[in-house]
C-alpha cells in the first residue's frame, strides 16, 4: 500500500514539474521582452536627442552669421529676438508663433528607470504599462486612509479646528483634463485609468476631514476660467473677489470697443441695476443700446441677478495732441459705448456664473471686437470714399 502511495505522489510531482517550469520560463520571457523593449526605446531616444542637438547647434551658428553676432553672445534671449525679427507674425496665439529652442525644452521627455547590479528595476511598477498613474492611485489610497483615520481620532475632540473636519472646498475649480494630466505626469494612459483617478479623487474630496489634504487636491485641479483662456480673443475672464463690507461676490475687468474704453464691475446677488457713467438703463433712448446692454443677461438667463457699474472714457482724448493745436473733445459713439460695456459685462458674468461660459462664448459675447475707425485720407471726403472723377 505504501508503495502505491509513493508511486502516485512521484507521478504527480513529475507531471507538475514540467508545467511549473514552463510557466516560469514564460514569465522570464515576458520580463526579458519588457527589458529589451525598454532598452531599445532608450537607445532610440538617445540617438534622436543627439541628432536634434547637433541640428540646433548648426542652426544656432547660421543664425549668428545672419545676425552678425558672435556665437558666444547668442544666448536664448538673443535667439528669441532674432526669430521675432526674421519671422514677424501677426498670430494672436503665442503657441502658433515660430520658435527656436533646445530640443530638451520642446521634445517630450523619456521616462527612465533605475536598475540594480543584477539588472532588475528598483521600482515594482516598472512592469505595468503606466507606472506613474498607478503610483498616483496608490498615493490617493494612502491619503484616503490617513484622512479617515484622522477623522476617527479627532471627531469628538476640541484640539483641532472644525474646519479641518469638513470636506475640502473645491468650489470654482474642476479636475484637470486627461491631456493636462498626461503632460503633468509625462506618461500616456487609457481613458479607463483616467476615470479611475477621477473617481478616487472625488471619493477623497467627499470624505469629512479631507480639508487637511486641500493642497494635494488643488494640485490636480484648475480654475474653471482657465480652460477658456486660449479660446478667447482679448481680455481673459477675470477672477472673482468678495467684498469685505457687503460680503458679495464681484468681478471687474477693463475692455474697449473702437475708441471707447470701459471699466465694468458686476456684483452678484443684486437687483439688475445698471449704472453707466451715472446713467441708468432707461436713460438710453435707443432700443438698440438697451438690447446690447441686456444681451449677456439674456443669454446667461440671469436677468435681475447682477448689478452692473461701468465707467467709460474715450481713448483718443488721452492721446497727446500737437503743441500748436487745441485738444479735441471726442466721444465714443452711440453704439461703441454699449458694446464695450456689454463685453465687460459678459466677461464678469462668465466669472461669476461658470456654467454660462459656453453659451456666452458661442454667442460671441466673450470675444473682443478689434475693429477701429479708419482714418480719413488727405484730399478725400472719407476713409475710402473718392471724389467723382470728371473728364473736364
Swiss-Prot record:
Where it sits in the cell: the answer is: Mitochondrion
A single GO molecular-function term is: RNA binding
Q: Give the record's subunit note.
A: Component of the mitochondrial ribosome small subunit (28S) which comprises a 12S rRNA and about 30 distinct proteins.
Q: Does the keyword Mitochondrion apply?
A: yes
Q: Which stretches of sequence are listed as region Disordered? A: 8-27
Q: Which biological processes are named by the entry's GO terms? A: translation
Record family assignment: Belongs to the universal ribosomal protein uS9 family.
Its recorded name reads Small ribosomal subunit protein uS9m
| Gene3D superfamilies documented for this protein | 3.30.230.10
A GO-annotated cellular component: mitochondrial small ribosomal subunit
The gene designation is mrps-9
Supply the alphabetized keyword list.
Answer: Mitochondrion, Ribonucleoprotein, Ribosomal protein, Transit peptide
Q: Name the Pfam families on file.
A: Ribosomal_S9 (PF00380)
Q: Which organism is it from?
A: Caenorhabditis elegans
Point to the regions of Low complexity compositional bias: 8-25
Per the annotation, which location comes first and is thus the protein's main one? Answer: mitochondrion
Amino acid at each position: 500500500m505504501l508503495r502505491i502511495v509513493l508511486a502516485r505522489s512521484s507521478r504527480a510531482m513529475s507531471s507538475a514539474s514540467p508545467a511549473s517550469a514552463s510557466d516560469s520560463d514564460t514569465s522570464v520571457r515576458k520580463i526579458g521582452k519588457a527589458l529589451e523593449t525598454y532598452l531599445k526605446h532608450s537607445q532610440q531616444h538617445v540617438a534622436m536627442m543627439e541628432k536634434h542637438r547637433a541640428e540646433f547647434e548648426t542652426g544656432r551658428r547660421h543664425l549668428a552669421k545672419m545676425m552678425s553676432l558672435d556665437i558666444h553672445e547668442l544666448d536664448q534671449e538673443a535667439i528669441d529676438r532674432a526669430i521675432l525679427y526674421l519671422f514677424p507674425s501677426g498670430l494672436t496665439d503665442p503657441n502658433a508663433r515660430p520658435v527656436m529652442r533646445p530640443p530638451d525644452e520642446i521634445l517630450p521627455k523619456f521616462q527612465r528607470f533605475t536598475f540594480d547590479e543584477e539588472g532588475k528595476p528598483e521600482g515594482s511598477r516598472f512592469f505595468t504599462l503606466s507606472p506613474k498613474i498607478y503610483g498616483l492611485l496608490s498615493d490617493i489610497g494612502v491619503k484616503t486612509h490617513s484622512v479617515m483615520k484622522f477623522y476617527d481620532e479627532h471627531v469628538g475632540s476640541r484640539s483641532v479646528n472644525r474646519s479641518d473636519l469638513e470636506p475640502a472646498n473645491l468650489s470654482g475649480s474642476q479636475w484637470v483634463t486627461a491631456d493636462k494630466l498626461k503632460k503633468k505626469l509625462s506618461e500616456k494612459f487609457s481613458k479607463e485609468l483616467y476615470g479611475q483617478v477621477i473617481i478616487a479623487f472625488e471619493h477623497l474630496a467627499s470624505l469629512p476631514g479631507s480639508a487637511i489634504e486641500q493642497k494635494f487636491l488643488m494640485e490636480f485641479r484648475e480654475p474653471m476660467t482657465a480652460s477658456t483662456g486660449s479660446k478667447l480673443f482679448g481680455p481673459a475672464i477675470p477672477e472673482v473677489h468678495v467684498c469685505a463690507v457687503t460680503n458679495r461676490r464681484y468681478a471687474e475687468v477693463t475692455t474697449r470697443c473702437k475708441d471707447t474704453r470701459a471699466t465694468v464691475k458686476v456684483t452678484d446677488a443684486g437687483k439688475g441695476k445698471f449704472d453707466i457713467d451715472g446713467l441708468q438703463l432707461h436713460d438710453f433712448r435707443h432700443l438698440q443700446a438697451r438690447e446690447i446692454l441686456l444681451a449677456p443677461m439674456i443669454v446667461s438667463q440671469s436677468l435681475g441677478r447682477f448689478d452692473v457699474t461701468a465707467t467709460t472714457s474715450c481713448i483718443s482724448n488721452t492721446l497727446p495732441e500737437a503743441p500748436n493745436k487745441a485738444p479735441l473733445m471726442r466721444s465714443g459713439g452711440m453704439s461703441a459705448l454699449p458694446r464695450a460695456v456689454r463685453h465687460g459685462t459678459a466677461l464678469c458674468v462668465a466669472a461669476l456664473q461658470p456654467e454660462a461660459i459656453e453659451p456666452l462664448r458661442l454667442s460671441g459675447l466673450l470675444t473682443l471686437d478689434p475693429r477701429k475707425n479708419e482714418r480719413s485720407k488727405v484730399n478725400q471726403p472719407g476713409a475710402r470714399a473718392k471724389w467723382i472723377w470728371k473728364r473736364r
